[in-house]
From Swiss-Prot:
GO BP term (any one): thiamine diphosphate biosynthetic process
Cofactors required: [4Fe-4S] cluster
NCBIfam families, sorted: PRK13352.1, thiC
InterPro entries noted in UniProt: ThiC (IPR037509), ThiC/Bza_core_dom (IPR038521), ThiC/BzaA/B (IPR002817)
Chain's gene name: thiC
PANTHER family named in the record: PHOSPHOMETHYLPYRIMIDINE SYNTHASE, CHLOROPLASTIC (PTHR30557:SF1), THIAMINE BIOSYNTHESIS PROTEIN THIC (PTHR30557)
Organism: Geobacter metallireducens (strain ATCC 53774 / DSM 7210 / GS-15)
Gene3D superfamilies: 6.10.250.620, Radical SAM ThiC family, central domain
Family the UniProt entry places it in: Belongs to the ThiC family.
Cofactor note: Binds 1 [4Fe-4S] cluster per subunit. The cluster is coordinated with 3 cysteines and an exchangeable S-adenosyl-L-methionine.
Pfam family of the protein (one): ThiC_Rad_SAM
Annotated residues for binding of [4Fe-4S] cluster: C412, C415, C419
GO molecular function annotations of the record: 4 iron, 4 sulfur cluster binding; carbon-carbon lyase activity; zinc ion binding
Protein name according to UniProt: Phosphomethylpyrimidine synthase
């Protein structure tokens, strides 16, 4: 008997969630079903997420954008994180990941889930680590295997739609990293926790060793596995090295095991990657992971732009998505510097939405060009309201025009009376009047 979207799809059954996703994407329900059955499309929606909107991610669909929010040990203001969630969704984020590591994390997660109907992701390992330190008064390395899985169940029960789990961080991958040498070692927080735990306990990664236990939990909630890249490169110099690719090979093997068990999977990717290596990274992931949806952090194309990493992210994200990545995790101007502000979240979401939209045009996603064509028509007519309504960020567009002073001639203050549109309109009108 089918219990997950993947199992229903493989039995030829179109579910209500598939129909809802198809309507949102402008494709047929059968297109969604076929993609899910093949493992190239997923629908992120935990059966416990009552107010949640099913989110389809994958081949042939619009590129999605995720916004990371969450507290830290230094900033535990819940109201601020809820405002970030609202702002992210208002500006077009498709998903929100709660990465809270400070304050009442259970309360924060539940409040974020209640605040929005967007798709919600999390990293349950953070919860297990925090509980070990704060509740049990121990260290991260004192987490038990049961602690880790209890954290996963807690997030599943709360209605989290997808969880990042660093199952590919194994002893063999750590050895490859050591043997080859890396400039920045492990920059993934979950990956670092796992490596530390493995070294201290002289044991294999519990999420790898007990992967079947993980599948039982996620299948029960139809919760999507986002197989995390614990060895993602944290600088350009470490991109596409043996540790990164070895982990990707393992994730490809785990993808097959998960799909065989009826569990939906996506793969997380880098990271910091030079422009000329991005397409190769996408090709490798799609080949090694059997076409599973690819969820990338950036990638950032240079390491020297702190304060502007939403731009380095958008550049890499546009290239990655045009090459086949399906899901972009935003980066804010505060990346590498501080916990992002509400304004940082807004800028990060918009930057990644620009990248996603540009890539969708390049990929030929159905309907991707329609707004661009409409915008061109509005610009030609100097229809400012139409331009604002079509903008990715109408508020900023309106503000900038208002600040410059609205000219009587209807053009902008860049060209004024020498506006090319007005000049051409006058020229064409004169030709018509002359009978030409």
């Amino acid at each position: 008997m089918a219990t997950t979207q993947l199992e229903y799809a493989r039995q030829g059954i179109i579910t209500d969630k598939m129909k809802e996703a198809a309507l949102a994407e402008g494709v047929s329900p059968e297109f969604i079903r076929e993609g899910i059955a093949a493992g190239t499309i997923i629908i992120c929606h935990n059966i416990k997420h009552g107010n949640g909107r099913p989110l389809a991610v994958g081949k042939g669909l619009r590129t999605k954008v995720n916004a990371n929010i969450g507290t830290s040990a230094d900033d535990t203001d819940i109201t601020k994180e809820l405002e970030k969630a609202r702002v992210a969704v208002r500006h077009g984020a498709d998903a929100i990941m709660d990465l809270s590591t400070g304050g009442p994390v259970d309360e924060i997660r539940r409040a974020i889930i209640a605040e929005t109907n967007a798709c919600i992701g999390s990293v349950p390992l953070y919860q297990a680590a925090l509980d070990a330190v704060r509740t049990k008064k121990k260290a991260i390395v004192d987490m038990t295997v049961d602690d880790i899985f209890e954290g996963i169940i807690k997030h599943a029960e709360d209605g989290v739609d997808f969880i990042t789990v660093h199952c590919g961080v194994t002893r063999s991958t750590v050895e490859r990293m050591k043997n080859e040498g890396r400039l920045m070692d492990v920059v993934s927080r979950g990956g670092a926790f796992t490596v530390e735990w493995m070294a201290y306990n002289n044991c294999e990664n519990p999420l790898f060793e007990h992967f079947d236990r993980l599948l039982e939990i996620t299948k029960a909630y139809d919760m999507t596995l986002s197989l995390g890249d614990g060895f993602r490169p944290g600088c350009l110099a470490d991109a596409t090295d043996r540790a990164q690719i070895h982990e990707l090979i393992i994730l490809g093997e785990l993808t097959q095991r998960a799909q065989a068990a009826g569990v939906q999977v996506m793969i997380e990717g880098p990271g910091h990657v030079p422009l000329n290596q991005i397409e190769a990274n996408i090709l490798l992931q799609k080949r090694l992971c059997h076409g599973a949806p690819f969820y990338v952090l950036g990638p950032l194309v240079t390491d020297i732009a702190p304060g502007y990493d939403h731009i380095t992210c958008a550049i890499g994200g546009a290239i990655a998505a045009s090459a086949g990545a399906d899901f972009l995790c935003y980066v804010t101007p505060s990346e590498h510097l501080r916990l992002p502000s509400v304004e940082d979240v807004r800028e990060g979401v918009i930057a990644s939405r620009i990248a996603a939209h540009a890539a969708d045009i390049a990929k030929g996603v159905k309907g991707a060009m329609e707004k661009d064509i409409a915008m061109a028509k509005c610009r030609k007519k100097l229809d400012w309201e139409g331009q604002f309504n079509l903008s990715l960020d109408p508020e900023k567009a309106q503000r900038l025009r208002a600040e410059s002073g609205v000219a009587e001639h209807g053009a902008c203050t860049m060209c004024g009376e020498f506006c090319a549109y007005k000049v051409m309109d006058d020229a064409m009108e004169k030709q018509r009047a002359a009978g030409h």
